[in-house]
Amino acid sequence: MKKLVLCVSILAVILSGVALTQLSTDSPSNIQVAERPVGG
């Protein structure tokens, strides 16, 4: 079970990284706003 969770988590990290790179290339402004803390 632990191996399964590890595989899923690694896949999620890779997918999120790819999605972030694609979004940053499409709209860098949205990424900058998302990375900023809500408090300012």
Curated annotation (Swiss-Prot):
Keyword ATP-binding attributed: no
InterPro entries to which the protein is assigned, alphabetical: Phr_regulator (IPR053652), RapG/K_inhib (IPR030968)
Provenance organism: Bacillus subtilis (strain 168)
Description of post-translational modifications: Contains a predicted signal peptide cleavage site in the N-terminal region, however the propeptide is probably only subject to processing events at the ends of the mature peptide.
Physiological role: Signaling molecule involved in the regulation of genetic competence development. Secreted during production, but the mature peptide acts intracellularly, indicating that it needs to be imported into the cell to function. Stimulates expression of the genes controlled by ComA, a transcriptional factor that regulates the development of genetic competence. Acts by inhibiting RapK, which regulates the activity of ComA.
Mutant phenotype after disruption: Deletion of the gene results in decreased expression of genes activated by ComA, and significantly changes the expression of 40 operons.
Propiece residues: 1-34, 40
Official protein name in the record: RapK inhibitor
